[in-house]
Structures are given as structure tokens and as C-alpha cells.
Amino acid sequence: MDMKKLLAVSLTIMILGTLGGCGKQDTQEPPKVKIDYGNSELYTQEDMDAAIQVIEAEVATWEGCELHSLAYGGDAACSDENIEWLNGLEMKEQTEPFTQYILFSSSFHSPVEQRDAWDADTEYEGLQWWLGRSDGGAWELVTCGYG
């Protein structure tokens, strides 16, 4: 093969290799969150999924944290005692008392570098999420933490 042909073939391979990466989008999907819906006579899976979306949106604001699992806390969490307690918490956005509550516990991993209140590169388990709504309305995050 003469030098011109070798150069032309090499150049063509180089150009095609460079163009091959153009237009590619990041196809890596976010990690799947393991969901345990448990058994409920109060809430449908659709009700729970709506609450889960609120939780996932909140965790998405926690830079570097990765949500691993959520587990429904059971129908007993929607007790009159808990409704009274949670309605007693001051929420700026709350315009009327909540009539329903739902509880989830979660596991998540903190960022590799220490940020906010979380220890660096640590798996946290059992963080509770309390959400409330009025008469089947939209779920609102009332509080989260360890209880």
C-alpha cells in the first residue's frame, strides 16, 4: 500500500471514530429504588406512588445522595394520635388540616465527600418520611428524620 492510501485510510478511520461519539446521549439510567408497598387497606399503590414521587423529589435535592429503598410504614401510622401530632407541626404551606398520613422508611447512600448533615460515603437506613394530605388531595412532605 502506498503512503497516500495508508494516510487516507488512517484519516478516514480517525474521522469515523471521532464522529461515532457525536450525538450520543448518556444512557445510564438512575438507580432503581426498591419499593416495599406492604399491605394496606387505606391506600392504593397509586396513592403510595404519589407519595413516593414527593420523597424522590426531595432526595433529588440532596446533592450526591442516592435513594436505595422505600418501605410503607403500615396503616397503623394513620392513627388519630399521629394525625393530631402531625397537624400540630407548623407548616407554612398547609392551608387546612391533613386528614390522612402515610409513613415510609428509607435507605440511602450519602455523597462520597461530606456534605450537609450526612457523614461521607455512608449507607443510612430507617430514615422516616411522614406525608399528609386532606381528603385525597396531593401529598405534602410534613417531616422526615429518625424517630
Model-derived features: positions:
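Sec-dependent N-terminal signal peptides of Gram-positive bacterial secreted proteins and lipoproteins
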Residues: 2-25
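Short beta-strand edge/turn micro-motifs at domain boundaries
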Residues: 125-147
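Exposed boundary/loop context
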Residues: 10-14, 119, 130
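Flexible low-complexity loop/turn motifs enriched in small/helix-breaking residues
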Residues: 20-115, 120-123
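A generic structural micro-environment signature
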Residues: 7-9, 73, 137
